[in-house]
């Protein structure tokens, strides 16, 4: 039992998105837990979305995993004891490493893992396994924004300012972000600003916009270049800011100079007049923010698209100016902390580069090993999944906190690769679609049953507090990592199971890094301090560092203190419509579901609100395909077919259809999505794939999920 598990109520945070809304949980057993939003937490201020209100329901999911499962020779998963399950995993790992080398064992983590879990997972992979083959599902979420922000500012923090700054803004531009559905409590901070929304869909957020720009999917880069062109051509740039705080403007302008508004209109469909109006609104605002979301980022050129929006923000003098700025809306619950703590293919804790000799030496010293023993960078997430079971790819995969059988692009291929493994191990709270394929399934705790820390979208480190003991034989992921590490010959003390002890090591590992947590302690967090990283440990006689809620006010994180314009130019999406596939499909989230749906599809209230896959389509487009509202449709791309219920929407672009990606089985949107990768980040092109629609004969009609 933990130090807090005997309490009947705890202050903690929602288990879903990166807002990490403050909540208060009460109850003595899983079946009677209640949740209330906390008015004292500034991000949600007493607000909570439908998912947050229903989160306790998942604690008693009918198929909650309560015991380890192992697959018998006959093919069935059957209950087993922890020792037997971990022994089987360790035995297989040793065999595979002996026969194929350490990189034959891979690890895939998740952006919902606590900082402590993400940190220990990276250490486990690189030391206990000795593998370079580790990445996480944040590669499908924040990779583009992270790369662009690091290149421009020298460091990546989703929002380099508190969420509450948005409420005092005059104008906020949202590029590819439908926060009214994906982060509803954030909308209370967007009531005052005039909103500019860039989205091909007439989303719930776009409905509240003062100005809605609707580019064809895959053309954001041309639009952002055009907005920069307008700013320069109409004399709306902040020339003093550009001269005093940035470098590289001339090279960026060289590309934008060729994207005058009328040319942009031809490529994107956005009227030149609206382009000019958007720039006027931003430039005339006393305070303004530009924010990107997955709609701008999940492309084979996602990093360049975010860079183009950053260039616009820099030209207008927004980043590093109090009350204004640029930011990216982190999606997953710990998408920020998850990419800082070492579970990403090319990073070490503290947001250190795995190829930096000084960074390697620092982490090696903390871990008590030689820097030469640390593997180099491995494959990015999709490349890793695509290589599973191949001649030169991993033969074993350990999965914590994600469901790639549903969430990865070209999922038929991914499922085939998972099936080709010698060993698939999945730690989860429910039998997700990936867990159902596993050789060993390990039941782990969820948010109300564990301690730890989470870092939200504004870089604020938060305490997750335990209300209940785990049910059945469920254990923390930290116990899983310790159990496997010790069976592979590592000292038990090197893999603590107490989150507080892991955090103390994490503090030392992050010291001096870009994401410096060394001055943050559980004691300070429990005392109610609001601590945003970087928060370095002070010298012996200095007071505690207060944290850094606003970055870049004095300088940017590059050695010369200047932000960088990045020269980028538009290029088409990886595929464009043709006679066989005349439409563009784009994917995204809906209000009642979350990520792969493994959690929310098990909550009756949420499942009732969004029970099956659908394809949102203009009535004229549907009619040309022989479809009526409510008909079951085949959505066919060059990679495969998904089934979805036709949903008329007169506001849709006639050339574009939309599918949510939360559903499993034949309704998986990722059966059709394109795994074309951004060369800078490994981000797949989730937002653009060419398709055609076909009706499903009545004799074959049924639920698409």
Regions found by a protein language model. Give the residues of each.
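N-terminal export/assembly segments and adjacent metallocofactor-ligating motifs
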Residues: 1-234, 244, 248, 252, ...
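Conserved short loop/turn motifs at secondary-structure junctions
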Residues: 106-113, 266-270, 293-300, 332, ...
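Flexible glycine/proline-enriched surface loops and loop-helix/loop-strand junctions
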Residues: 208-209, 259-261, 291-296, 461-469
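N-terminal leader/propeptide and maturation segments of large enzyme subunits in energy/redox metabolism
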Residues: 76-78, 234-272, 349-364, 369-372, ...
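Glycine/threonine-rich phosphate-binding loop and adjacent beta-strand/alpha-helix elements that clamp
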Residues: 163, 448-470, 481, 485-487
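Extended redox/cofactor-interaction regions of prokaryotic respiratory oxidoreductases
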Residues: 119-191, 195-198, 205-207, 221-225, ...
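Long, contiguous, secondary-structure-rich segments that constitute the structural scaffold
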Residues: 470-531, 596, 600-616, 620-705
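Flexible, glycine/charged-enriched surface loops at secondary-structure junctions
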Residues: 101-104, 237-242, 289, 320-327, ...
């Amino acid at each position: 039992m933990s130090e807090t598990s005997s309490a009947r109520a705890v202050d903690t945070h929602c288990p879903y998105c990166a807002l990490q809304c403050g909540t208060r949980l009460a109850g003595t057993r899983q079946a009677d837990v209640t949740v209330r939003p906390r008015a004292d937490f500034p991000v949600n201020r007493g607000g909570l979305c439908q998912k947050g209100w229903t989160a306790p329901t998942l604690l008693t999911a009918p198929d909650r995993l309560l015991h380890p499962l192992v697959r018998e020779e006959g093919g069935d998963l059957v209950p087993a004891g922890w020792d037997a399950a971990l022994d089987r995993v360790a035995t297989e790992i040793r065999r595979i490493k002996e026969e194929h080398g350490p990189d034959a064992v891979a690890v895939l983590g998740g952006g919902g893992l606590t900082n402590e879990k993400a940190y220990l997972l990276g250490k486990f992979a690189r030391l206990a396994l000795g593998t370079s083959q580790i990445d996480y599902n944040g590669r499908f979420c924040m990779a583009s924004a992270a790369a662009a922000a690091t290149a421009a500012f020298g460091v990546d923090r989703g929002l380099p300012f508190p969420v509450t700054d948005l409420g005092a803004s005059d104008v906020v531009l949202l590029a590819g972000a439908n926060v009214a559905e994906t982060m509803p409590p954030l909308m209370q901070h967007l009531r005052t600003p005039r909103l500019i929304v860039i989205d091909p869909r007439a989303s719930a957020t776009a409905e509240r916009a003062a100005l809605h720009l609707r580019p064809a999917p895959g053309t954001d880069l041309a639009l952002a270049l055009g907005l920069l062109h307008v700013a320069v051509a109409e004399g709306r740039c902040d020339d003093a800011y550009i001269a005093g705080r940035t470098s590289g403007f001339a090279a960026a302008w060289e590309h934008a100079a060729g994207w005058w508004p009328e040319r942009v209109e031809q490529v994107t469909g956005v009227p030149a007049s609206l382009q000019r109006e958007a720039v006027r609104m931003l430039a005339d605002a006393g305070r303004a923010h530009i924010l990107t979301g997955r709609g701008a980022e999940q492309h084979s050129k996602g990093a360049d698209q975010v860079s183009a929006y950053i260039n616009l923000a820099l030209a207008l003098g927004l980043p590093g100016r109090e009350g204004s700025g640029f930011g990216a809306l982190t999606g997953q619950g710990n998408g920020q902390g998850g990419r800082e703590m070492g579970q990403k293919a090319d990073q070490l804790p503290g947001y250190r580069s795995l190829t930096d000799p000084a960074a390697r030496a620092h982490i090696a010293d903390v871990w008590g090993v030689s820097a030469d023993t640390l593997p180099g960078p491995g494959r990015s997430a999709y490349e890793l999944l695509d290589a599973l079971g191949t001649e030169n790819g991993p033969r074993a995969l350990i999965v914590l906190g994600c469901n790639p059988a549903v969430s990865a692009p070209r999922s038929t291929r991914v499922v085939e690769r998972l099936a080709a493994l010698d060993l698939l191990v999945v730690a989860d709270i429910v039998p997700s679609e990936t867990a159902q394929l596993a050789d060993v399934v390990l039941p782990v705790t969820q948010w109300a049953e564990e301690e730890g820390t989470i870092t939200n979208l504004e870089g604020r480190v938060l305490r997750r507090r335990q209300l209940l003991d785990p049910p059945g034989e469920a254990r923390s992921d930290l116990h899983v990592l310790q159990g496997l590490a010790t069976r592979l010959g590592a000292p038990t003390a090197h893999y603590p199971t107490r989150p507080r002890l892991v955090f103390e090591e994490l503090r030392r590992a992050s010291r001096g890094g870009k994401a410096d947590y060394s001055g943050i302690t559980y004691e300070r967090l429990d005392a109610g301090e609001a601590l945003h990283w970087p928060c370095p440990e002070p010298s012996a006689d200095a007071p505690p560092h207060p944290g850094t809620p606003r970055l870049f006010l004095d300088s940017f994180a590059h050695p010369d203190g200047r932000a960088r314009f990045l020269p980028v130019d538009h290029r088409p999406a990886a595929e464009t419509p043709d006679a066989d596939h005349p439409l563009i499909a784009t994917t995204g989230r809906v209000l009642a579901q979350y990520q792969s749906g493994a959690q929310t599809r098990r909550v009756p209230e949420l499942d009732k609100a969004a029970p099956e896959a659908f394809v949102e389509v203009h009535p004229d487009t549907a009619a040309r395909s022989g479809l009526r509202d409510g008909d079951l449709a085949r959505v066919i791309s060059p990679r495969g077919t998904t089934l979805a219920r036709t949903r008329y929407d007169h506001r849709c672009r006639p050339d574009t259809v939309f599918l949510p990606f939360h559903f499993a089985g034949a309704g998986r949107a990722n059966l059709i999505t394109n795994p074309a990768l951004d060369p800078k980040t490994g981000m797949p092109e989730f937002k653009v794939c060419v398709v055609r629609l076909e009706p499903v004969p009545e004799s074959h009609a049924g639920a698409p999920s």
